[in-house]
């Protein structure tokens, strides 16, 4: 029996909507990364984009455990401007209370996806919204109840 390898024409993508209200960030990000890659499907093929499309709503209400949410000495995100001495930092608490709180989820998932062209394609299937509204009702997404899978998922 040969090992099954899916062809691009055989891949079926589903649409999922996940409510991130009071959900722990790391647990949510790791599950979403697996769903974007398609590792939850029996037809998973590593070199193809066989993952699903994920819509995350209420991203501003995601929870961080421990001291990571502390605005002063919490989890720090670094970026580099390209100039000498140009390293900038911000905390997860500042991002969540700022203008674009959905970036915390996008960064967490992006760092769990492979860093190549396939990973960029898979990240384009992730849609994160700060509030409860999303413009993807025409795709008829299925509600994915992440909070009830494990009591540790909710805080």
UniProtKB/Swiss-Prot annotation:
A GO CC annotation given for this chain: cytosolic large ribosomal subunit
Database matches in InterPro entries: Ribosomal_uL13, Ribosomal_uL13_bac-type, Ribosomal_uL13_CS, Ribosomal_uL13_sf
Superkingdom: Bacteria
Gene Ontology molecular function terms on file: mRNA binding; structural constituent of ribosome
Residues spanning the membrane: none
Subunit structure: Part of the 50S ribosomal subunit.
Alphabetized NCBIfam families for the sequence: rplM_bact (TIGR01066)
PANTHER family membership: LARGE RIBOSOMAL SUBUNIT PROTEIN UL13M, RIBOSOMAL PROTEIN L13
Role according to the record: This protein is one of the early assembly proteins of the 50S ribosomal subunit, although it is not seen to bind rRNA by itself. It is important during the early stages of 50S assembly.
The protein, known as: Large ribosomal subunit protein uL13
Name of the coding gene: rplM
